[in-house]
Amino acid sequence: MIAMPSLHRLVALVLTSVSYAYAFTMPSLTKKQSYRLQALSHHDDRKTLPDFPTEITRRRALATAVVASSLVIPSLSDATNSIPFGASWRAVDGLNSANNGNFVSFDKSAYRAMRDDPTRTPLFEKAIIQRLGDDPESRVVLDLGTGPFALFALVAAERGAGKVYAIEANPEAAQSARDFVRKSGYQDVITIVEGYSTQVELPEKVDFCVAEIVGSIASEEGAYATIKNAHRFLREPTRPDSWIPRRIQTYAAPTSYTLHNLFGPPEFDWTKLDGEPVRFNCRDKGLELLSDPVLVEDIDFADIFSSAQTQRNAKKDLVFTVDLDRIEENTLNLFDEFRRDKRTSVKESEALAYQTAHSFTGIASWPRLILTDNLVLDSRTYPTGDHQKSHWQTVLPIMTERPIRGLKGNEKIKVSVDFILPEDVMISPRYRMEGVIEM
């Protein structure tokens, strides 16, 4: 039997190697950073990491990465004048059913995460109550994609809606929704309609539609094709207040990613992802933005026909400028994370924090929902894109085999974004991002 070194020893060995490498390659930190690092090295404050029971802590993930692979040491000399990157993928949010390759289903834990999101659910409830107004009994409501809990259908019924139709394509979720409606005593108000919304009919027109069919890239659950078809259910489909949300957006920004700096070839080959994005909890600080976010997708539900061509093929050419202030702040934040483990020295933590914060992995995306004129739901903070709790995820395609390192601030990141949104809800949206960094 070969004796394995302790995990602590492996971490120390790898981090020490990074420190020695940086003795030759890493510029001095700014005065602001040095003061902060010095102060941090003398206190033992251990802030609690986000509590998500289905996830391991980032510190454990980093330690596992060190065991599983060798660290790729940075080299500023690797940079050239113009470095290409890119990725393309097809939307799959959830699990494909074995019985239907086009059917996207969700397990109950995903539904519970949506239901229990402390920002999402209360804001949707507030928007529904506002729209029901002073005469809710006269309102006919559609809950498109009601899920196993018939959550928003029940909100409308409990607040006095005269009639609610709740469409659900997943047979198992539809049956669960019927059970919840029956147990709640609203079976005379709520009718569960099983099937794809594009393939069912309603006996009457509705006053407004609640459609929480928004992916972590806003369009990836087929919102474009679904809402376009759903116009036939509405009395006045071109009125903005006929829809909750009334528009959905996707924001994006270039990012650095900690594990991309720890995992590297040949032990770990990022190209095997074949463009498929990594998805992050929006509170995960292993992913840091390198510039301010920009709007890359904007789908107006009421106006979906008049601007359909623009929305179906959302092609944009973007230019991001790497923000030195963000890099410096990211370095400090990452250093703070690495120093949570007292066994790593200031020098070791400084080296890995610098390497990660000054690198580029890809273009991250996340959704924003405009529910009403005065209610907006953000998965990351707006407009800065900072971390916050959300059941939606931040989507990051790994766009290079190794991180592009040596960023100093003010580099131009030029990106061509192409979102292809099919007319048929049974065909998955496709996404492509490619560009160059001008060093």
Q: Predicted regions: what is each one?
A:
Residues 20, 72-76, 371:
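Hydrophobic membrane-targeting signal helices
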Residues 9-10, 46-51, 106-110:
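General secondary-structure propensity
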Residues 21-25, 77-82:
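Boundary at the C-terminal end of the N-terminal hydrophobic targeting segment
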Residues 60-80:
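N-terminal export signals
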Residues 83-144, 149-418, 422-438:
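Class I SAM-binding transferase module
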Residues 1-34, 39-47:
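N-terminal chloroplast transit peptides
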Residues 47-67:
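N-terminal secretory signal peptides and thylakoid transit peptides that target proteins
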